[in-house]
Swiss-Prot record:
Gene3D superfamilies noted in UniProt: 2.60.40.790
A Pfam family: HSP20
Domain sHSP: 86-203
Entry protein name: 22.3 kDa class VI heat shock protein
Subunit structure: May form oligomeric structures.
PANTHER family the UniProt entry points to: 21.7 KDA CLASS VI HEAT SHOCK PROTEIN
Cytoplasm listed as a keyword: yes
SUPFAM superfamilies found in the cross-reference section: HSP20-like chaperones (SSF49764)
Amino acid sequence: MPPRRGIEVRQAVGDGAAPRWRMSLLENTFSSFLQSIGGGVAADGAAARAVFGEGSLFSPFLFGKFFDPADAFPLWEFEPEVLLAALRRGARTTVDWAETDSEYYLRADIPGGRKCDVEVSGDDAMRVVDVSGLWRAAPPPPPPDGRDWRAGRWWEHGFVRRVELPEDADWRKVEAFFDDGEGLLEIKVPKSGDAHQAAAATA
C-alpha cells in the first residue's frame, strides 16, 4: 500500500483571493453527464459515480443542492452529526470533520483519486482552502489551445471543492496529507494563537 504522504499546501499570491473557476456550471450540465456516466470516465465511471452519486463532499449535488465548485462551501457551519447523517443515507461515510481546542480536522474519502492538490488563500474577509485532484485513469491530452482542465469539462478529469474556513483558523499553517492507496485526504487547520489561548483559559 502506498504510504501516507504530506501534500505541499500552496498559498495564493496577489490580493489573497483565489481565482474563481473559469467555467460556471449548470445543473443540467451534470444531469446529462450522470446519465451517460457508464463509460469513458475513470475505470468505466465507477470512481466518478461513487463521488457524484453518494453525497460526497466533492459532489456537485451535495445534500441535494447544486454547488458550483467556484463557491466556497461553509463546512464549519454544519454539525458533524448532521453532516454524517446525510452521507450515511448513501451507505457511505465519505467526509468527517472535528474541532479541538487547538485545530480543525477534515478527512474525506476520494474514491478513485490518484492525485490531490491543496491550495489555501485568505484575506480579512474570507479564508478558503481549494482542494483539487485527478482520477486514476490517465487524463486525455490537453487541448491544442493550452487551456487547463478547469476551463472545460473538468469533471471528466478530476474533482474540486472550495472549503471556507472559520474566522479563527490560521490559514497560513494548514497541513494536508493524502493516502494514494485508499484515496484518503486529511487536512489539519490550526487555530490562531488567540483562539487557542482563549480555549485553554476557559477549560
